[in-house]
């Protein structure tokens, strides 16, 4: 039972001394697919087809940097003793919430510079972000990381998972919860929901609902993981951040609904906030 017949090597191929890992390839595929999905929404919104290029570039760049900084902050006792490890990203260690924060800030700045409405852009890219996240979780699978607690092989078989997933959940002599798969399915479901209801939502609400949906799933799935960043011995950082994002997002939606009094559900489509003109 303990033999892995289809073990996946995290390294896809080597270019001389450089090892190209499946993790990086899958993340890149997720970003590219998300970009093409967002492009379709962009054209429907009447914006120039190149509008997202700078936004995605800077959001991805600063999101990656912020994801590393976020991870280092919550693992500071280790990095304080091993400062040379801070820049060794190839040893692992990024956090999606840090990436979201960095990407969000960069995206808003680019929107302001280009005189774009950040709420409209947020609505356009929200489904793409959660789709990319769902795809990116398979990079964790390839790295044999971000898994949950130990389970039996019988438990995994009861989930009717493909053998290659079951066999690669056998890590260091033990089977584990495939939390990467749980989150991937949750994210893809969120993508499907968002692309089907966003035309009935008001400006900004698609993005806020993305944050809410993702955070609900992350809160529960995080409770199964064994590699969580911890604020204290009992408080997981990702769960705390998820709760905050849920409260903030729902509060903003409710606040706008009360202040501007639009119908809860409209067949007309998204209407802009009373803000600067969308270009």
From Swiss-Prot:
Originating species: Staphylococcus aureus (strain NCTC 8325 / PS 47)
Bilayer-spanning residue ranges: 18-38, 55-75, 89-109, 203-223, 235-255
Main EC class the enzyme belongs to: transferase
GO terms of molecular function: phosphatidylglycerol-prolipoprotein diacylglyceryl transferase activity
Family per record: Belongs to the Lgt family.
Organism ancestry: Bacteria, Bacillati, Bacillota, Bacilli, Bacillales
Protein task: Transfers the N-acyl diglyceride group on what will become the N-terminal cysteine of membrane lipoproteins.
Family annotation (InterPro entries): Lgt (IPR001640)
One GO cellular component term noted in the UniProt record for this chain: plasma membrane
Entry membrane topology: Multi-pass membrane protein
Subcellular location: Cell membrane
Pathway membership: Protein modification; lipoprotein biosynthesis (diacylglyceryl transfer)
EC number: 2.5.1.145
Binding, a 1,2-diacyl-sn-glycero-3-phospho-(1'-sn-glycerol): 137
Name recorded for this polypeptide: Phosphatidylglycerol--prolipoprotein diacylglyceryl transferase
Main location: membrane
A single GO BP: lipoprotein biosynthetic process
Top-level taxon of origin: Bacteria
Keywords of this entry: Cell membrane, Membrane, Transferase, Transmembrane, Transmembrane helix
Pfam family, one: LGT
């Amino acid at each position: 039972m303990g033999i892995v017949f289809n073990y996946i090597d995290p390294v896809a191929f080597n270019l001389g001394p450089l090892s190209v890992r499946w993790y990086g390839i899958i993340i890149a595929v997720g970003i590219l697919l998300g970009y093409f999905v967002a492009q379709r929404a962009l054209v429907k919104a009447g914006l120039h087809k190149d509008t997202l290029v700078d936004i995605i570039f800077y959001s991805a760049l600063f999101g990656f940097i912020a994801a590393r900084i976020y991870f280092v902050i919550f693992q500071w006792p280790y990095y304080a003793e091993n400062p040379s490890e801070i820049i060794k990203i190839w040893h692992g260690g990024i956090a999606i919430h840090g990436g979201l924060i960095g990407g969000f800030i960069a995206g808003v700045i680019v929107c302001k510079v280009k005189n774009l409405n950040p709420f409209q852009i947020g609505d356009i890219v929200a489904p793409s972000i959660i789709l990319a996240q769902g795809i990116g979780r398979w990079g964790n699978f390839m790295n044999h990381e971000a898994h949950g607690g130990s389970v039996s092989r019988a438990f995994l078989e009861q989930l009717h998972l493909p053998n290659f997933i079951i066999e690669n959940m056998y890590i260091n002599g033990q089977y584990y919860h495939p939390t990467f798969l749980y989150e991937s399915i949750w994210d893809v479901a969120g993508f499907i929901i968002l692309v089907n209801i966003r035309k009935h939502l008001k400006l900004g609400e698609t993005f806020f609902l993305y944050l809410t949906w993702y955070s609900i799933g992350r809160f529960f799935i995080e409770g199964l993981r064994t590699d969580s960043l911890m604020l204290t011995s009992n408080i997981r950082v990702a769960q705390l951040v998820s709760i905050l994002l849920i409260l903030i997002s729902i509060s903003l939606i409710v606040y706008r609904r009360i202040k501007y009094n639009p119908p809860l559900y409209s067949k007309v489509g998204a209407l802009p906030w009373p803000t600067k003109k969308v270009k």
